[in-house]
Amino acid sequence: MTTFLGNSVTFTGKQLQVGDIAKDFLLIATDLSQKSLKDFEGKKKVISVVPSIDTGICSKQTRTFNEELSELDNTVVITVSMDLPFAQKRWCSAEGLDNVILLSDFYDHSFGQDYALLMNEWHLLTRAVLILDEHNKVTYTEYVDNVNSDVDYEAAINAAKILP
Protein backbone atom coordinates (compact mmCIF):
# COMPACT_ATOMS: atom_id res chain seq x y z
CA MET A 1 0.00 0.00 0.00
CA THR A 2 1.28 3.46 -0.92
CA THR A 3 0.38 6.58 1.04
CA PHE A 4 0.59 10.29 0.27
CA LEU A 5 0.00 12.82 3.05
CA GLY A 6 -1.20 9.95 5.23
CA ASN A 7 -3.85 8.72 2.79
CA SER A 8 -3.83 5.57 0.66
CA VAL A 9 -3.43 6.13 -3.07
CA THR A 10 -4.11 3.93 -6.08
CA PHE A 11 -2.39 3.53 -9.42
CA THR A 12 -3.30 2.44 -12.93
CA GLY A 13 -1.07 -0.04 -14.70
CA LYS A 14 1.58 -2.50 -13.62
CA GLN A 15 4.78 -1.52 -11.84
CA LEU A 16 7.97 -2.25 -13.72
CA GLN A 17 10.00 -5.16 -12.42
CA VAL A 18 13.69 -5.95 -12.79
CA GLY A 19 14.11 -7.70 -16.14
CA ASP A 20 11.22 -5.89 -17.87
CA ILE A 21 11.85 -3.86 -21.00
CA ALA A 22 10.67 -0.30 -20.38
CA LYS A 23 7.99 0.98 -22.73
CA ASP A 24 8.84 4.06 -24.77
CA PHE A 25 7.51 7.35 -23.43
CA LEU A 26 6.80 10.82 -24.75
CA LEU A 27 7.50 13.61 -22.27
CA ILE A 28 7.94 17.38 -22.53
CA ALA A 29 11.32 19.01 -21.86
CA THR A 30 11.89 22.44 -20.33
CA ASP A 31 12.30 23.91 -23.83
CA LEU A 32 8.88 22.40 -24.76
CA SER A 33 10.43 19.84 -27.09
CA GLN A 34 9.20 16.26 -26.95
CA LYS A 35 11.55 13.61 -25.58
CA SER A 36 11.19 9.87 -25.80
CA LEU A 37 13.13 6.95 -24.43
CA LYS A 38 14.61 6.62 -27.92
CA ASP A 39 16.32 10.01 -27.47
CA PHE A 40 18.54 8.34 -24.86
CA GLU A 41 19.15 5.18 -26.89
CA GLY A 42 22.40 3.39 -26.13
CA LYS A 43 22.78 5.07 -22.73
CA LYS A 44 22.15 3.81 -19.24
CA LYS A 45 19.28 5.73 -17.69
CA VAL A 46 18.58 6.69 -14.08
CA ILE A 47 14.96 7.87 -14.06
CA SER A 48 14.17 9.75 -10.88
CA VAL A 49 10.43 10.29 -10.50
CA VAL A 50 9.06 12.96 -8.16
CA PRO A 51 5.61 14.45 -7.44
CA SER A 52 6.76 18.09 -7.79
CA ILE A 53 10.20 19.60 -8.23
CA ASP A 54 9.17 22.47 -5.92
CA THR A 55 9.13 20.39 -2.73
CA GLY A 56 12.09 19.82 -0.43
CA ILE A 57 12.31 16.05 -0.83
CA CYS A 58 11.88 16.23 -4.61
CA SER A 59 14.56 18.91 -4.92
CA LYS A 60 16.90 16.85 -2.74
CA GLN A 61 16.27 13.74 -4.83
CA THR A 62 16.98 15.59 -8.07
CA ARG A 63 20.15 17.24 -6.76
CA THR A 64 21.47 14.06 -5.12
CA PHE A 65 21.16 11.85 -8.19
CA ASN A 66 22.60 14.52 -10.46
CA GLU A 67 25.54 15.19 -8.14
CA GLU A 68 26.28 11.51 -7.55
CA LEU A 69 25.62 10.00 -10.98
CA SER A 70 25.91 12.58 -13.74
CA GLU A 71 29.62 11.84 -14.20
CA LEU A 72 29.12 8.11 -14.83
CA ASP A 73 30.16 7.01 -18.31
CA ASN A 74 27.37 6.60 -20.84
CA THR A 75 24.70 7.42 -18.24
CA VAL A 76 21.93 10.02 -18.20
CA VAL A 77 20.01 11.11 -15.13
CA ILE A 78 16.44 12.07 -15.96
CA THR A 79 13.99 13.57 -13.48
CA VAL A 80 10.30 13.28 -14.33
CA SER A 81 7.50 15.16 -12.61
CA MET A 82 4.04 16.45 -13.41
CA ASP A 83 5.23 20.07 -13.12
CA LEU A 84 4.82 22.36 -16.08
CA PRO A 85 8.04 22.71 -18.09
CA PHE A 86 8.13 26.42 -17.19
CA ALA A 87 8.27 25.57 -13.48
CA GLN A 88 10.95 22.96 -14.11
CA LYS A 89 13.05 25.48 -16.04
CA ARG A 90 12.61 28.09 -13.31
CA TRP A 91 13.72 25.53 -10.69
CA CYS A 92 16.88 24.73 -12.69
CA SER A 93 17.71 28.44 -12.94
CA ALA A 94 17.07 29.05 -9.24
CA GLU A 95 19.22 26.05 -8.26
CA GLY A 96 21.99 26.94 -10.72
CA LEU A 97 21.76 23.53 -12.37
CA ASP A 98 22.18 23.78 -16.11
CA ASN A 99 22.77 20.15 -17.05
CA VAL A 100 19.78 18.56 -15.31
CA ILE A 101 17.39 16.72 -17.61
CA LEU A 102 13.89 17.51 -16.33
CA LEU A 103 10.92 16.11 -18.22
CA SER A 104 7.21 16.63 -17.62
CA ASP A 105 4.31 14.19 -17.89
CA PHE A 106 1.74 17.00 -17.58
CA TYR A 107 0.42 16.67 -21.13
CA ASP A 108 -1.34 13.31 -21.10
CA HIS A 109 -0.06 11.44 -18.02
CA SER A 110 0.86 8.47 -20.24
CA PHE A 111 4.26 7.94 -18.60
CA GLY A 112 2.65 7.77 -15.17
CA GLN A 113 -0.05 5.41 -16.38
CA ASP A 114 2.27 3.12 -18.36
CA TYR A 115 4.80 2.84 -15.53
CA ALA A 116 2.17 2.67 -12.71
CA LEU A 117 3.44 5.94 -11.24
CA LEU A 118 0.36 8.18 -11.50
CA MET A 119 -1.48 8.62 -8.20
CA ASN A 120 -5.09 8.51 -9.38
CA GLU A 121 -6.39 10.60 -6.49
CA TRP A 122 -3.90 13.45 -6.97
CA HIS A 123 -2.93 13.35 -10.66
CA LEU A 124 0.69 13.55 -9.52
CA LEU A 125 3.49 11.06 -9.95
CA THR A 126 4.60 9.01 -6.97
CA ARG A 127 8.22 8.98 -5.82
CA ALA A 128 10.31 6.30 -7.52
CA VAL A 129 13.65 5.42 -9.07
CA LEU A 130 13.99 3.30 -12.19
CA ILE A 131 17.34 2.28 -13.64
CA LEU A 132 17.56 1.01 -17.21
CA ASP A 133 20.50 -0.41 -19.11
CA GLU A 134 21.47 0.64 -22.64
CA HIS A 135 18.76 -1.63 -24.06
CA ASN A 136 16.02 -0.25 -21.75
CA LYS A 137 16.03 -3.38 -19.63
CA VAL A 138 15.04 -2.54 -16.06
CA THR A 139 17.92 -3.29 -13.67
CA TYR A 140 16.60 -1.57 -10.52
CA THR A 141 13.29 -0.22 -9.24
CA GLU A 142 12.10 1.48 -6.11
CA TYR A 143 8.50 2.60 -5.75
CA VAL A 144 8.29 4.18 -2.29
CA ASP A 145 5.53 3.16 0.13
CA ASN A 146 5.28 6.65 1.63
CA VAL A 147 5.51 9.36 -1.03
CA ASN A 148 6.51 11.86 1.67
CA SER A 149 9.75 9.97 2.40
CA ASP A 150 13.09 9.72 0.63
CA VAL A 151 14.08 6.99 -1.75
CA ASP A 152 16.92 4.70 -0.72
CA TYR A 153 19.69 6.84 -2.21
CA GLU A 154 22.50 4.47 -1.32
CA ALA A 155 20.83 1.45 -2.93
CA ALA A 156 19.92 3.33 -6.11
CA ILE A 157 23.34 4.96 -6.47
CA ASN A 158 25.09 1.63 -5.95
CA ALA A 159 22.77 -0.04 -8.48
CA ALA A 160 23.62 2.63 -11.06
CA LYS A 161 27.35 2.41 -10.40
CA ILE A 162 27.55 -1.37 -10.82
CA LEU A 163 25.97 -1.38 -14.27
CA PRO A 164 28.64 -2.55 -16.72
Swiss-Prot record:
Residues 16-162 form the Thioredoxin domain. Disulfide bonds join C58-C92. GO terms for molecular function: thioredoxin peroxidase activity. Keywords: Antioxidant, Disulfide bond, Oxidoreductase, Peroxidase, Redox-active center. It comes from the Bacteria. InterPro entries: Redoxin (IPR013740), Thioredoxin-like_sf (IPR036249), Thioredoxin_domain (IPR013766), TPX (IPR002065), Tpx_CS (IPR018219), Tpx_Peroxidase_subfamily (IPR050455). Gene3D superfamilies: Glutaredoxin. It catalyses: a hydroperoxide + [thioredoxin]-dithiol = an alcohol + [thioredoxin]-disulfide + H2O. It holds the Pfam family Redoxin. CDD domains: PRX_Atyp2cys (cd03014). Belongs to the peroxiredoxin family. Tpx subfamily. NCBIfam families: PRK00522.1 (NF001808). Homodimer. Thiol-specific peroxidase that catalyzes the reduction of hydrogen peroxide and organic hydroperoxides to water and alcohols, respectively. Plays a role in cell protection against oxidative stress by detoxifying peroxides. This is Thiol peroxidase.
